[in-house]
From Swiss-Prot:
Lineage: Eukaryota, Metazoa, Chordata, Craniata, Vertebrata
Domain notes: The F-BAR domain has an atypical, flat shape and binds preferentially to flat membranes. Upon heterologous expression, the isolated F-BAR domain is localized at the cell membrane, and causes the formation of cellular protrusions. Recruited to clathrin-coated pits via SH3 domain 2.
Highest taxon listed in the record's lineage: Eukaryota
Originating gene: FCHSD2
Expressed in which tissues: Liver, brain, heart, placenta, skeletal muscle, pancreas, lung and kidney.
Composition bias, Pro residues: 646-657
Protein name (Swiss-Prot/TrEMBL): F-BAR and double SH3 domains protein 2
Length: 740
């Protein structure tokens, strides 16, 4: 740990600043004098050479032409967008009109050489006067700052003394009367102490007032120094040197133009084309001459001598196929994650740039550092995303279903970003500090899923055109055999629980009595009407009469592990069903509680390692959400679950076998608005933990084909069979039941 920086006195800091100001002004003055001297000597030499007629002029120009300038070639000598050809053409034109310079030697002496010497002499004198005046002004400011330091010191001493007297008086007032002390003596001491405290308070107040007045005067003096005195000194030091320099530069070209028509044509052409010098063209020439900056050839695949393949290969039904699918899923997840990182960092960058003016001077450097870090993070995320997209393009070329994984991952990320946008509080500026700038930065370090609990609720939009409140119970009218992995086989007269709509019309997602979930044709089902509630309750009562007689051992282990295990154990909840594509991947249903073993790996592919039902494996992190500290078993209701007896079902009206979450987990699913987090009361937990009836067995935990995480069907639903296939005698009326 480094020691804290040493505090520098205000007076010493002011002296250092003033010394640096003086040094910079002298350096600026010296540079201007050097430029005047260069112009003066150049005019003298040129006039002397003109006296010697053409020989002397050619000698002068040849001295400058001998220098090798980069970017000057024979084929681009007439391209005046480059600065070096312009300067070279100027020297060549000088040599061409050498004989005409004899008549203008006096003009150089009268208009440039002598005035430049006079201007430089005056500038040296002005520098001496300005330095003396600036030194005097700086000394006055130093004296003001010294008075401020004295007033501050006196204020601190008197205030500390007054504080000590006040503390002593408070202690004496709270002390009890001793056996050997009389009340009169205590009163005298109290009066004396109060007088002392009043005197110290008066001195402290006087010192504070003097300090504040001195502070105001010092600030005013400092403002005067920077806004008036320093500006006037710099203006006096510059004088009219820039006007003289401008006149000298004009005199060089004007004198040459007035010599003769040939000279006029030459320098008029140079004058017009000198303004065409641009940085982009000079940079282009530089890149053309230096091949080291050119883009090299793409890297080529170098096969082994015995290998004849030159591209990715996929064999159906082999491990390679699963490996390529895993790579597609891995890099699609990475693309989505980096897209989210770019959006977050761009949001941080916009906040920093928009609120930069409100930041105080002390934190300006920190603000610039944060802006640079945000831009660097965006650049890195764009590179990672570009590399991942290149991998996906190559996988797509050989037929891997890249679009499926990419669409699924991007939909998830876009829903999270939309939810974050609505849940994101506005930026608040207070005391020059932006309190909302760190929120988006911290979000990149740990993805926040707490605001995304309502993202997956699709019940508000029904593709079929009918608004329904899911889940609801319906009856199968026609039998249907699943033809796709994400579909569900149903039998006639079977009772299903419809949980949500599909993306395409005439498809809905349903769960059967054994807990299997999949898509079924909507027209194959009979949805409940507004009557026959009693018959529906009677037909469904038997399915749930035994739901409160058994408990789940996995739930008991989870609660016990949360209470008795390590406090650092982290749990996550599955947002979708997932089936592992390889042996080392973990399979789990929606709502499952998974214990996290490791969040970091060497590939950084978005996969975490966890344990579920005694099995250890890896799984995509975008399919789960982290549970908060209260949900990991640190709240009292988790302890009450173990000791509270299960309530017996009411004899008159048994509960309906409708579930707000998959039977594989005792906790509510995040895509149901009726429950966001774990239950908050013991009674609510008991109902949730014992809501699983024997009719909905645990055998459906590993049914990945019907997972929520896969894409919804985009195929057309099959038409229902003819009406003769249905037996009208067995028509059953259903009723829509919404759980609260």
């Amino acid at each position: 740990m480094q020691p804290p920086p040493r505090k520098v006195k205000v007076t010493q800091e002011l002296k250092n600043i003033q010394v640096e100001q003086m040094t910079k002004l002298q350096a600026k003055h010296q540079a201007e004098c050097d430029l005047l001297e260069d112009m003066r000597t150049f005019s003298q030499k040129k006039a002397a050479i003109e006296r010697e007629y053409a020989q002397g002029m050619q000698k002068l120009a040849s001295q400058y032409l001998k220098r090798d300038w980069p970017g000057v070639k024979a084929d681009d000598r007439n391209d005046y967008r480059s600065m070096y050809p312009v300067w070279k053409s100027f020297l060549e034109g000088t040599m061409q009109v050498a004989q005409s310079r004899m008549n203008i030697c006096e003009n150089y002496k009268n208009f440039i050489s002598e005035p430049a010497r006079t201007v430089r002499s005056l500038k040296e004198q002005q520098l001496k006067r300005c330095v003396d005046q600036l030194t005097k002004i700086q000394t006055e400011l130093q004296e003001t700052v010294k008075d401020l330091a004295k007033g501050k010191k006196k204020y601190f001493e008197t205030e500390q003394m007054a504080h000590a007297v006040r503390e002593k008086a408070d202690i004496e007032a709270k002390s009890k009367l001793s056996l050997f002390q009389s009340r009169i003596s205590l009163q005298k001491a109290s009066v004396k102490l109060k007088a002392r405290r009043s005197e110290c308070n008066s001195k402290a107040t006087h010192a504070r007032n003097d300090y504040l007045l001195t502070l105001a005067a010092a600030n005013a003096h400092q403002d005067r120094y920077y806004q008036t005195d320093l500006v006037n000194i710099m203006k006096a030091l510059d004088g009219n040197v820039y006007d003289h320099l401008k006149d000298y530069l004009i005199a060089f070209s004007r004198t040459e133009l007035e010599t003769c028509q040939a000279v006029q044509n030459t320098f008029q052409f140079l004058l017009e084309n000198s303004s065409k010098v641009v940085r982009d063209y000079n940079l282009q020439l530089f890149l053309q001459e230096n091949a080291v900056f050119h883009k090299p050839q793409p890297f080529q695949f170098q096969p082994c001598d015995s290998d004849t393949s030159r591209q990715l290969e996929s064999e159906t039904g082999t491990t390679e196929e699963h490996s390529l699918n895993k790579e597609a899923r891995k890099w699609a997840t990475r693309v989505a994650r980096e897209h989210k990182n770019i959006v977050h960092q761009q949001r941080v960058l916009n906040d920093l740039e928009c609120h930069g003016a409100a930041v105080s001077e002390q934190s300006r450097a920190e603000l610039e550092q944060k802006i640079d870090e945000a831009r660097e993070n965006i650049r890195k995320a764009e590179i990672i995303k570009l590399k991942a997209e290149a991998r996906l393009d190559l996988l797509k070329q050989i037929g891997v279903s890249v679009d499926t994984w990419l669409k699924s991952a991007m939909n998830q990320v876009m829903e999270e970003l939309e939810n974050e946008r609505w849940a994101r509080p506005p930026a608040v500026t207070s005391n020059g500090t932006l309190h909302s700038l760190n929120a988006d930065t911290e979000r990149e370090e740990g993805e926040e899923f707490e605001d995304n609990m309502d993202v997956f609720d699709d019940s508000s939009s029904s593709p079929s055109g009918t608004l329904r409140n899911y889940p609801l119970t319906c009856k199968v009218v026609y039998s249907y055999k699943a033809s796709q992995p994400d579909e569900l086989t149903i039998e006639e007269h079977e009772v299903l629980e419809v949980i949500e709509d599909g993306d395409m019309e005439d498809w809905v997602k349903a769960r059967n009595k054994v807990g299997q979930v999949g898509y079924v044709p909507e027209k194959y089902l009979q949805f409940p009407t507004s009557n026959s509630l009693l018959s529906m309750l009677q037909s469904l009562a038997a399915l749930d009469s035994r739901s409160h007689t058994s408990s789940n051992s996995t739930e008991a282990e989870l609660v016990s592990g949360s209470l008795n295990g390590d406090a650092s154990v982290c749990f996550v909840k599955a947002l979708y069903d997932y089936e592992g594509q390889t042996d080392d991947e973990l399979s789990f249903p929606e709502g499952a509680i998974i214990r996290i073993l490791n969040k970091e790996n060497q590939d950084d592919d978005g996969f975490w390692e966890g344990e579920f039902n005694g099995r250890i494996g890896v799984f995509p992190s975008v399919l789960v959400e982290e549970l908060s500290a209260s949900e990991n078993g640190d709240t009292p209701w988790m302890r009450e679950i173990q000791i509270s007896p299960s309530p017996k079902p009411h004899a008159s009206l048994p509960p309906l076998p409708l579930y707000d979450q998959p039977p594989s987990s005792p906790y509510p699913s995040p895509d149901k608005r009726s429950s966001l987090y774990f239950p908050r009361s013991p009674s609510a937990n008991e109902k949730s933990l014992h809501a699983e009836s024997p009719g909905f067995s645990q055998a459906s935990r590993h049914t990945p084909e019907t997972s929520y995480g896969k894409l919804r069907p985009v195929r057309a639903a099959p038409p229902p069979p003819t009406q003769n296939h249905r037996r009208p005698a067995e028509k059953i009326e259903d009723v829509e039941i919404t759980l609260v």
